[in-house]
Amino acid sequence: MEINRLRLNQYRSYAALDLRPGPGINAIVGDNAEGKTNSVEAVFLCAFGRSHRTSRDAELIMRGCAGGYVGAELTNNTGSHLIEIKLRDGERKKIFIDRQMASRSGELMGLLNVVMFAPEDLSIVKEGPAERRRFMDMELSQTHPAYYYSLQRYNSALKQRNALLKEPDRIGPGMLETWDEQLSALGEEIVMDRCEFIDGLSTIAYDLHKSITGGRERLEIVYEPDIDPEDPEGIYGAMLKALDRSRAEDLRRGFTTAGPHRDDIGIALSGIDVRTFGSQGQKRTAALSLKLSELAFIREIKEEAPVLILDDVLSELDEGRQQLLMESMKDCQCFLTCTSLEGLKRAGLGNMKVFRCKGGEMLPE
């Protein structure tokens, strides 16, 4: 899978950009605040239909302009495709796939598979459960597009139930029960997909981490669902029971306290919870193992390598971890941002396509 051409118009710091990346490593070099991350953000936008940095599409439009455009020509194992995203200030963005307007952003899922690794990805390990749920949701949406729609419907039903809980005077007979049944049916689909995902990921992560640490540490990744998937009543029955049991508490607090929106991933090193007790170095290594596992998982499920984005991340890793990362991306198209080529050359990345980013322009060397 690779992007053959990336076009930006009035997007962030770029009045116009027509980038023709190579199939291997594409190094985007420039000083801080020159727009390197803006270019890889556009790749992420084409994969997921949203930015990884902001939920406000208006921020993606170049300052002083009424609209913006992102277009990516790509090739995957189904053929050649064109993804276009048109932005207008004050309007919903429009997504086009092969020149046909998509009715929803979910139609993008799985068309352009992307794995992004940036310094903030340490939050997968060191922040709260919401970051780890986001990690699961992003990868499952790419490898199992039906999951994306189940999650969207679940979140919509959850929003409706929470709105009722905030205004108990509006609750009529059977109203909460209706939402409980919807949440339980959709929650069952989500929990089953997450179980399967973590089962596959944990095996890959264990082997990768063993390689990174020379066998000194064992990385254990476990799914920590809020609803027990092994309950004798099944996931659907267990969730109905949990929602009924927590109803008084939900009414008191004004939101739903049980369900997969409260799931987590357990991350342990040799039996020690790295989320709470790990050093910065251990958290960084665990995050790297998770990202490399994600890369391998998508490659296995989709039967082709995803596009890899490394946004100013090599400087965060020591030489050994850099080398492991380089080995893992041999068959990937990679967009790599950095302030200098020196570290890349030391890592043995002499054969790459280099683009210089400065003053709203990006030129090949």
Residue ranges and their predicted role:
Residues 44:
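Helix-to-loop junction immediately C-terminal to a conserved catalytic motif
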Residues 123-124, 130-177, 181-184, 189:
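Long, charged N-terminal accessory/stalk domains
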Residues 72, 333-340:
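Structural recognition of the conserved hydrophobic beta-strand(s) that form the central parallel beta-sheet
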Residues 1-31, 171-307, 316-320, 324-327, ...:
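Conserved NTPase motor "head" modules and their coupling/switch loops across ABC/AAA+ ATPases, GTPases
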Residues 311-313:
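Walker B catalytic acidic pair
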Residues 47-131, 137-143, 147, 202-207, ...:
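Nucleotide-state sensing region of NTPase/ATPase domains
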Residues 36:
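Conserved lysine of the Walker
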